[in-house]
Amino acid sequence: PNANESWKYTVVFNCVYGWHYAQIPSLGIWRSVKLESQAPVEIEAPFVSTRSLQGDMRLAVTLKKINAPLKGKLQIRVVPKNFEGAPQFFEHEINSSKKTEQFSFDFKIDAPRLWWPNDMGEQSLYDMTVAFIPRNGARPDVEKTSFGIRTIDMAPFPGGEREDRYNWTFVINGKPMFVKGTGWCTMDALMDFSLEKYDRLLSIAKSQHIQMMRAWGGGLPETDDFYELCDKYGIMVIQEWPTAWNSHNTQPFDMLQETVVRNMKRIRNHPSLVMWGAGNESDKPFGPAIDMMGRLSLELDGSRPFHRGEAWGGSDHNYNCWWDDAHLNHNLNMTSPFWGEFGIASLPHIESVRRYLAEEKDRWPSRPGDHFRHHTPIFGTMGEFGKLSQYSGYFMPDTTLGEFITGSQLAQVVGVRHTLERARTLWPETTGALYYKMNDNYPGVSWSSVDYYGAIKPVHYFVQKSFAPLTGVLLFDRTNLSSQEVSLPLYLLDDCRRLNGKDYTVSVTVYNDRLDTVVCREFNGHSELETVKNLGNLDLNRAQTKSTMLFFVVDVCSEGKRLSRNYYFTNYEVRRGVIMSMPCTEITMKRDGRQITVTNVGKLPAIGVYVESPGYAHEFIASKNYLWLDPGESQIIEVNVDYPVCVKGWNIN
């Protein structure tokens, strides 16, 4: 309601103008300034594209006369960037009388190594040096870039092409894939775009099995560091231009066009970049500006698709949970051919909340007008505290700030992980799911899995399980199963065909509120190239579901080894706080450098076991967290800090 509308009349990082998150418009020069001398003939924006996976490549390069003719040699050197290999050299004679001319050259990489998305293979990269040597002996010009050998095609849904839908099946290097992803929010309202900050967030995304990020039209084209790290980590990028909600109709056309041209030339060599998008949530993505973006995506690139809008043409955004106050059951059941956005907002880590509450950090409950309510999605003007109370209240009482935060974060876990898992089971009718979102540009309540200060929320570790290449998943249509007959579909998901040709066992064990075993059932099979396998249903009667809590543990085993574990919790609405009041067990912790071994030495399962480093949540990363440990079981957790750590859990003494 109090947004600064001026962003609609220029081209800026628009989500910090008060329509969301922050009202801190950034102005001025925000990158380093440098002077460069001009060569007699300049090389402009070399563009490398893949013609075939056998290493057939094409270089398009523009030569511009400054004070010497376009006569000389164009020399090209290609060398592996992140693996061992011999350099290759190519040379072309140039003899042109024009002032500016674009040249295209085909070349072939010997023994090519491909660039693959995260979890699908290696991210092989090459460095290229392009030099123009003038015939008259004048100073040469040299440009450097990097690239990957990677093809992208878009295939239709199984029903075939439709006029009202884009082709939404991503085919990378000839392989159709279900895309696992999230949204990317330009990461700082005051434009702190340091390499270290990028690397923290993107390395966390890699460990979450993220394969795609949608860099939305609420932000801006990122710095080179962002795309280089996405290349390194195998994270594909949908890059939208900075328009939102039909702002392309009022933004200066020339300024938008310059933004597109400059940035498209700058980033188009990155193999991680797989799609151009016109902007965010415009319900009428038409007109001269949108047409210009589409035309330039062909003229300046042509190797990747362009979409005129998002959500559009078969993709969906859904926020009935949160803005429409829908029950969590809504997210458990909703489906889409391709999820572009969905999620539930939650509070950050308690250390982060106390940090931005400052002198109000010990004030609870929250009062209207205080810092707590200001740091909500629209500054407390749209009933956000009531929404937080609703979703947190499904899990926890609101007696303390800590309980309120925990409940909010658990609601986010449930509202995200079930939608992602259901989407995966629907492949190939559903071809991808991008939850909203990875990160924040301002401290406060939001949909992110990592808060503004860098602290990781629980949803990260649960998405890590939901997006694991190999996992078993149960589908739930409601959060409360108490005293009801239920039949829960069970699926085996194996994106990388790790089980191909092998026998497997998927076991499901159900525990009640005394942590007694209610049901233990095994589903046995032999894998033959399936990435999605329906194993049947887990049936429970009313007596078996009559409990204030139910826990479901799904293990995938083969050749005598457990290969993955997933677990679920239901019935928590029967009594607030019951999820944290299960019979207790005891955990021991042993540290060896940055390796933490946690062991359940009690007689009952340990639920939600996690390690943290008090006071350093903004720096801390664990390789995995929120574990289910059977009695006697040990797990090793890698951490990234040398600070003291402690182990906690939902039922630990």
Language model features: what each stretch is:
Residues P1-M213, P221, T425-L426, Y461-N653:
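Secreted/periplasmic carbohydrate-active enzymes, especially glycoside hydrolases
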Residues A3-W7, F13-Y17, A22-Q23, F157-D316, ...:
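Active-site mouth of glycoside hydrolases
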Residues Y21, E44, D141, V261-G369, ...:
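Active-site region of glycoside hydrolase catalytic domains
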Residues P25-G28, W276, A326-K502:
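Substrate-binding clefts and catalytic carboxylate motifs of secreted carbohydrate-active enzymes
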Residues Q38, G218, E281, A311, ...:
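Flexible loop residues that form catalytic
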Residues R135-A138, K232-V237, R266-H270, E299-S303, ...:
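Secondary-structure transition/capping motifs at alpha-helix termini
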Residues T151-D153, T186, W245, S346, ...:
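Feature marks short, surface-exposed loop/turn motifs that line or immediately flank catalytic pockets
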Residues T243, I344, K603:
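Short, glycine/acidic-enriched loop or turn micro-motifs at the edges of active sites
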